[in-house]
Design a protein with these regions (language model features):
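Metal-assisted phosphate- and nucleotidyl-transfer catalytic regions
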Residues: 15, 96-222, 226, 241-267
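Short conserved micro-motifs at the rims of enzyme active sites and ligand-binding pockets
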Residues: 43-44, 64-65, 200-202, 226-228
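Short, glycine-/Ser/Thr-/acidic-enriched flexible segments
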Residues: 23, 37-39, 57-59, 78-81, ...
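A residue-level signal for conserved active-site and pocket-lining positions in enzyme catalytic cores
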Residues: 32, 47, 76, 126, ...
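Hydrophobic (often cysteine-bearing) scaffold residues that line and stabilize catalytic clefts
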Residues: 32, 36, 86-90, 165, ...
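Internal, well-ordered alpha/beta segment that forms a basic, Gly-enriched binding/recognition surface
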Residues: 42-49, 58, 79-124
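Class II aminoacyl-tRNA synthetase-like tRNA-binding/catalytic domains
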Residues: 1-85, 95, 178, 282
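Active-site pocket scaffolds in enzymes
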Residues: 232-302
Length: 302
């Protein structure tokens, strides 16, 4: 269902709110989903093992060459399989798109041969290689991030006293890391910091990192995947921390979906991934803007 009681609980993820009015005339706050993730994990908890969704999703405050407020997401899950399985799925689908289009993936002046074996690069290694930052030195042994330790390594990159560790991490990622990814071949950026785990489980034996990855071509993020977290209490703590930050930053917070959290406790080990379908089409056709591959782009203000 596209209407949800909670659209997702990430600090910088913005949803479209709607009012659902019942037969009694009483309104109820609902949201257009930003991803089918919550609904699909409820299905995993109910016993489904291999599922996918190919649907429109909505995200507010997103507009640009690579962003549309409404876009198409392909999301799928494999119960009982490691997250490397959905990595392989994703690469195979991107390769199929390139083969069908009959040309390398391209965006602006960048090219990517999807038929070549992908590069699998750890986030820690990427920060060292492309930004000269020792990311592991910015974590406590339990994975707690130290904003001052990261601030001391970012050099001339813009920073403010209000920035969190996650703010600085994202700024380095976008400005110094992402432009170097997916050049010539697909890059799988793997093993994200636990502080950026979202809904991913921690890496076994290394609590500072998580089973989260993103797939890039031509410097563009195409997909985001997890080895899925099934610890209800841990997920609740993460959601509350994210909503506290959202409240501090934007003055709003979204409710928690208690049915979803209860489903996590029953969900089997699984891996899952969400792919931005329109971005794949963009790169396969060489389109410069996402609006060029949407059947009916969201209209601009007159």
């Amino acid at each position: 269902a596209a209407l949800q009681i909670s659209p997702g609980n990430e600090a910088h993820l913005h949803a479209f709110g709607v009012e659902a009015i019942g037969n009694d005339g009483v309104g109820r706050q609902m949201y257009l989903h930003t991803s089918p993730e919550f609904a699909m994990k409820k299905l995993l908890a109910a016993g489904e093992t291999r599922i996918y969704s190919f649907a429109h999703v909505w995200r507010n405050r997103e507009r640009g060459a690579l962003h549309s407020p409404e876009f198409t997401m392909l999301e799928w899950y494999r119960a009982g399989e490691p997250y490397a399985a959905v990595m392989d799925d994703c690469v195979a689908l991107i390769r199929l798109a390139a083969e069908t289009a009959g040309s390398p993936l391209r965006y602006r002046d960048r090219f990517c041969d999807a038929c070549l074996p992908p590069e699998r690069l750890g986030v820690v290694e990427a920060f060292d290689r492309h930004a000269g930052i020792d990311l592991m030195a910015t974590f406590a042994p339990d994975g707690t991030p130290d904003v001052d330790a990261l601030r001391s390594q970012i050099g001339p990159l813009r920073a403010t006293d209000d920035d969190t560790w996650s703010d600085l991490f994202a700024r380095v990622l976008v400005t110094r890391i992402e432009p170097n990814l997916g050049q010539g071949r697909i890059t799988i950026l793997d093993r994200y910091p636990a502080a950026e785990a979202a809904l991913a489980r921690r890496l076994p034996g290394e609590p500072r990192l998580a089973e989260r990855f993103e797939v890039y071509a031509c410097g563009v993020e195409l997909a985001n995947g997890f080895g899925e977290l099934t610890d209800m209490d841990e997920q609740r703590r993460r959601f509350i921390a994210e909503m506290d930050e959202k409240q501090r930053r934007y003055g709003v917070r979204y409710p928690l979906d208690e049915d979803f959290l209860a489903a996590l406790a029953r969900m089997p080990p699984a891996s899952g991934i969400a792919m931005g379908f329109d971005r794949v089409v963009m790169l396969a056709t060489g389109a410069p803007r996402i609006d060029d591959v949407l059947w009916v782009p969201v209209g601009e203000r007159p």
